[in-house]
Amino acid sequence: PSQATYYKHFTEKYKGIALWHTKLAKEVMNTGKIKIPSGREFAFPDAKRYASGKITHFTQVKNYPVQSFATADIVPLILMHVDKLLSTLKSCVVNSVHDSIVIDIHPEEEKQVLFLLHSANQDLLSIINRKFNIDFNVPLLLEAKIGNNWLDTKDII
């Protein structure tokens, strides 16, 4: 299907997200910027409205708040929480890549780490709410894979 058809179906299926996109576009046209819950701002000083009603940079206007909030705010917050949960174990957080947290799991602690990740999953929304004072009305869950390397992983959460 064409891009226009795809977007039309998207906005019909996800009306709340479409309304939020419209709100972001209005914010950019009124203020020239978007402010996300963490306080980070994205400036769009050259944004203009086309005769069709759409605005320039609309893809960035829709994408920056989501990608930024996820990778620059939520992931580090949860990374610190998971690191704290693992603090008494031999297993440890060794890296983060985009929206992934990499944990080196000691062989004897696999079940314990899995339990702690389930716990972190249960705490996720309340941690975000406490830090940023927002309530998510969309699912936000951790996913976990385990393996000896990135190529040989299996889903565990």
Would you name each region that the model predicts?
Residues 1-157:
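Conserved catalytic core of nucleotide polymerization and phosphodiester-bond processing enzymes
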